[in-house]
């Protein structure tokens, strides 16, 4: 089954070209089926790139997905055209009376700030509380996951002395988890962050279960059944060249930056990077969508009750 996207959204042509099944809302309305309603609260500066990354993973599942783009109500983005935001995004205050089968809260390049110093923190707290009554399952990604685990459990993020940057080996520490169905025991995940979560502090928080972890990069994926949520601190959704773009940007700006670890062949930035995480990215998000499908009520109004 396809993902439903407006025909004018850039992701529509991108995913169609890649062979992902995409359909317009008009065509979807003629099908006698209830699609899963998945929201993307997009906090990243490069909105279109992030839309494409998550739509690609969500759209690869065998279920029809109604993909809704959501923004913070008052925050004004500086890196995406206002026309794009107006055409495709809805402010949270407009959707907060609606029900969603799933919600993804993305990362944001604001790790250096205390949570309370983020300009939209109060509304984001409202969003996170709202998920408990209006969303069947929520997926917090990188800073979004750190914000959620702090909001619900007061587990703090910690500043790193050097940026965790590259593709790091991770272990499957919960092979019986339905979210890890089909996962290998050992695999790589892109990492790009200045902060970390600490395993001992996660272990001390009641109700949390670590599913993926790395000796080098620390805890990665945490399940929070009590809040119907997953928190991932790394970036399965990244394109093959996302780390390259970040590295090239910092080099061009004269910022100190290490070559991303285990990313380029022979750690040589002149060589094209290899994508070694794509299959596990599709597994994780496909398993998440399947778990939503198995658990969400047929009547959306029953979500959260």
UniProtKB/Swiss-Prot annotation:
Subcellular localization(s) per the UniProt record: Cytoplasm
Pathway assignment: Amino-acid biosynthesis; L-methionine biosynthesis via de novo pathway; O-acetyl-L-homoserine from L-homoserine: step 1/1
Entry's Gene Ontology cellular component terms: cytoplasm
Ligand binding (substrate): 163, 192, 249
Catalytic reaction annotation: L-homoserine + acetyl-CoA = O-acetyl-L-homoserine + CoA
EC class of the enzyme, as a word: transferase
Residue positions of the active site: 142 (acyl-thioester intermediate), 235 (proton acceptor), 237
Domain of life, source organism: Bacteria
Enzyme Commission identifier(s): 2.3.1.31
Residues annotated as site: Important for acyl-CoA specificity: 111
Site residues (Important for substrate specificity), renumbered to this chain: 192
One annotated GO biological process: L-methionine biosynthetic process from homoserine via O-succinyl-L-homoserine and cystathionine
UniProt key word Glycoprotein: no
GO molecular function list: homoserine O-acetyltransferase activity; homoserine O-succinyltransferase activity
Function: Transfers an acetyl group from acetyl-CoA to L-homoserine, forming acetyl-L-homoserine.
The protein's name: Homoserine O-acetyltransferase
Organism: Cereibacter sphaeroides (strain ATCC 17023 / DSM 158 / JCM 6121 / CCUG 31486 / LMG 2827 / NBRC 12203 / NCIMB 8253 / ATH 2.4.1.)
Source organism phylogeny: Bacteria, Pseudomonadati, Pseudomonadota, Alphaproteobacteria, Rhodobacterales
